[in-house]
Amino acid sequence: PYTTLFRSAYNLCSRVQGREASEAVGDAAMVMTAGELLQLHHRGNASLDEPTYFEIVRRKTAALIAVSCALGVAASGAGQPLQDALRRYGRKIGVAFQIQDDVLDLTGEERVVGKSVRRDLSKGKLTLPIIHRLSTAAPLDRGALLRLIEQAAAEGPSGDAAADQLMADVRDAGSIDYARSVGERLLEEALPELEALPAGPARDMLNYSTRAVIERRF
């Protein structure tokens, strides 16, 4: 998907006068490639911690949304300060968006989400709720959780037994709520960046859309 997105982005950027847009997309592509490699390196790593998780997300989803926000205002002729503000905004909501994706992958219903759920577990990818649960578990509980994670990965998306048991534990331990609270905090940090925009319908729509990032169910 990223390859198709960036191919289309480069095609559009080639029609814009000046090279700033192409350079911005190119820089984002390099950052996202590094993020993908970092994620592959840590796939199946039960010791993955929150700082590394956030570094991966910042280099992937957040980098894509940040450059999109910055280029959007750049296309309107906005100066560098406004571009920087929207880039910071995009980076924050990009991380929040990914956190909500993590939550939906564990708690969502396929018919509502619109795609397969529990794909991360089947691929051996640890997401924020799982990472938080592992970090707060007692040693014996952590061992049991790791076995459930291995079973869920072995069962794949079609298997439910281990994934259901793991999901119940993660939810009851408060790790789903924890992940949502992190997303909420990021949105609260992102919203002030929109004050750099002139008051009007565009800013109002962005304020409204920001809430949808973590309230969405698909």
Where are these regions (language model features)?
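All-alpha prenyltransferase/terpene-synthase fold signal
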Residues: 1-218
